[in-house]
Amino acid sequence: MARYTGPKCKLARREGTDLFLKSARRSIDSKCKLDSRPGQHGAKQPRLSDYGIHLREKQKIRRIYGVLERQFRKYFAEAERRKGSTGENLLQILESRLDNVVYRMGYGSTRAESRQLVSHKAIVVNGEVVNIPSYQVKAGDVVSVREKSKKQVRIAESLALAEQIGFPGWVSVDPKKMEGTFKNAPERSELSSDINEQLVVEFYSK
């Protein structure tokens, strides 16, 4: 399955919520009518069946993190194997992806841009260049911008904005050095309450 490269607003309208695909730090443009379906006439969202509700939540989470279906299923299987809550485990696996950590540290303004930085070898983990967006970052890992990439204006601008707003508690970042530490995978209480991971667990359990 190919990665979606079309209008980001269309995805947000399909899910009926801001997926933060266009900007990392602010809500989506008001022109994007989230209560209307995508399309020329933008009909109102229909009432969903129980299956539809579960499917939409799964799709929403998958699109927020920019993960394809096959990989998302693998993450769910891994989450089931781990001790504890399967739903929380799933979110921690997604949050530990290198592209997501780069986003959380403010190097990229969106997860898509952060994924591009990783793929273009602009990111270093513990002193080694890593160009795999799905790489699982571990507690204590140091994630920084590669020396030759520190002059990129987009990285500096994104970091400046992230510093103003504040970094999440599970990472520590030195904006001047463009270096950060992944302290630990976030607890469920630290993540968005707009996500209902239990619906994903129920979806795959049916």
Swiss-Prot record:
Under Gene3D superfamilies, the record lists: Ribosomal Protein S4 Delta 41, Chain A, domain 1, RNA-binding S4 domain
**A GO biological process held by the record:** ribosomal small subunit biogenesis
Locate the S4 RNA-binding domain: which residues?
Answer: 96-156
Q: Which SUPFAM superfamilies match?
A: Alpha-L RNA-binding motif
Task: Enumerate the SMART domains for this protein.
Answer: Ribosomal_S4, S4
Looking at the UniProt entry, the stretches that span the membrane are: none
GO cellular component: a single term: small ribosomal subunit
Q: Which InterPro entries does its entry note?
A: Ribosomal_uS4, Ribosomal_uS4_bac-type, Ribosomal_uS4_CS, Ribosomal_uS4_N, S4_RNA-bd, S4_RNA-bd_sf
Keywords, A to Z, come to: Ribonucleoprotein, Ribosomal protein, RNA-binding, rRNA-binding
GO MF term (any one)? rRNA binding
Please give the function described in this protein's UniProt entry: One of the primary rRNA binding proteins, it binds directly to 16S rRNA where it nucleates assembly of the body of the 30S subunit. With S5 and S12 plays an important role in translational accuracy.
Q: Which family does it belong to?
A: Belongs to the universal ribosomal protein uS4 family.
Which PANTHER family does this one have? 30S 40S RIBOSOMAL PROTEIN (PTHR11831), SMALL RIBOSOMAL SUBUNIT PROTEIN US4M (PTHR11831:SF4)
| Record's subunit section | Part of the 30S ribosomal subunit. Contacts protein S5. The interaction surface between S4 and S5 is involved in control of translational fidelity.
By what name is this protein known? Small ribosomal subunit protein uS4
Report the source organism: Laribacter hongkongensis (strain HLHK9)
